[in-house]
Regions:
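Conserved small/polar residues in nucleotide/adenosyl-binding loops
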Residues: 2-9, 354-360
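Beta-rich carbohydrate-recognition and catalytic domains
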Residues: 8-240, 244-293, 298-351
Length: 360
């Protein structure tokens, strides 16, 4: 039977980082961070047992002047805590003002964005403002595999050279920070201030609910809305994608009801109070796998003065070759309901099957 051991270390005089030694083959340990004896956050990391593959930093700046306790539970089978103390990680677990993030990887992409360290996938909440592109993304800062979902953050003036920033939104008591989208609230509809950046994302804990965070400094730091969740459904749903609909004068949000094989459409005057207007997808298109990461957009019809609405639905798995894919539906949208032009049994795939996959 697996038994957890608990090791505590109290830090008062903080340096910039706590460096965590990682071994890829080790089981996950749980690190609970307590601030002034109250739970602040929790994450999993594969703390080194036999050898150290690399170090990852835990940023401490936000805790300066506070008493921080790290409550670490290892995942190994032990007979007593002394066995856990022999693990390789304890020799190199240390405080530091520096972290070596030099890129020594020969095969790291040059033009494609990658984080300085850690694991990433879905791009989230992208926006352009004041001459800069902002990219948020699903990010695990504590290992090279999926887990500990945060919103990482980078910015660029040319979409080639990227400046990396601290994590924008991190998990809290409502759960991990899954995919979502963001908008520039030019008219202060939410009441947080003109040109505030509003992010809506899925909080994934015991259930999947939708949360809001806002930024008053062009997306560099976010404040989590105190009245979250803003949408709580009785079924699994995720990946909110929102936009302003001029004709109805409301914000529209599309939410993937993953296991129902549907997209739910909501409207709001203020980004905080949402009304479910309709659903689309039951019996339509590819019904295999999980529906997720939707998008709904109005596009011009080539050679005419008309427009059509396109609803993009990512699935995983269920693609033509068995893996992930993106399907799309063409139709009309009146601010409440999406009406598809084609019959339910017709499935339209994006040209490369995956190039639109899991974007927000």
């Amino acid at each position: 039977r697996q038994r957890q051991m608990c090791i505590r270390d109290r830090v008062q005089e903080l340096q910039k980082y706590l460096l965590l030694p990682v071994e890829e083959a080790a089981p996950e340990a749980t690190v609970n961070v307590l601030v002034n004896n109250k739970a602040d956050q929790s994450f999993q990391v594969r703390l080194a047992v036999n050898r150290i593959d690399y170090l990852v930093p835990f940023a401490l700046d936000q805790y300066r002047g506070k008493t921080v306790t790290f409550d670490i539970h290892t995942g190994n089978s032990r007979t007593n805590v002394r066995d856990a103390m022999a693990d390789a990680c304890w020799k190199e677990l240390k405080l530091s003002d520096t972290f070596d993030d030099a890129n020594r990887e020969v095969f790291r992409p040059f033009y494609h964005h990658t984080p300085v360290y850690g694991w990433m996938n879905d791009p989230n909440g992208m926006f352009y403002k004041d001459g800069e592109y902002h990219l948020y993304y699903q990010y695990n800062p504590y290992g090279s595999m999926w887990g500990n979902m945060n919103w990482g953050h980078s910015s660029s003036k040319d979409l080639i050279s990227w400046q990396h920033h601290p994590v924008a939104i991190q998990p809290n008591g409502l759960g991990a920070v899954f995919s979502g989208s963001s908008v520039v609230d030019k008219d202060n509809t939410a009441g947080f201030g003109k040109d505030a950046i509003i992010a809506i994302y899925t909080s994934a804990g015991a259930s999947q609910i939708q949360s809001l965070a806002y930024s008053l400094d062009n997306g560099m730091t976010f404040h989590v809305y105190e009245n979250n969740p803003i949408i709580a459904a009785d079924k699994e749903c995720r990946d909110p994608n929102m936009f302003w609909h001029e004709k109805s004068g409301k914000w529209i949000l599309v939410l993937a009801a993953a296991l129902e094989k549907e997209m739910w459409i909501y409207s709001s005057p203020d980004l905080k109070n949402w009304t479910k207007e309709s659903s689309f997808g039951h019996g339509y298109g590819a019904q295999e796998g999980v529906w997720e990461c939707p998008d709904l957009m109005e596009l011009p019809v080539r050679g005419t003065d008309r427009t059509k609405w396109v609803l993009i639905c990512n699935i995983n798995p269920g693609g033509p070759f068995g893996g992930s894919a993106a399907q799309y539906f063409v139709g009309d949208f009146d601010g409440k309901t999406f009406t598809c032009d084609t019959k339910p049994e017709v499935t339209k795939w994006t040209v490369s099957y995956t190039h639109l996959r899991a974007h927000e």
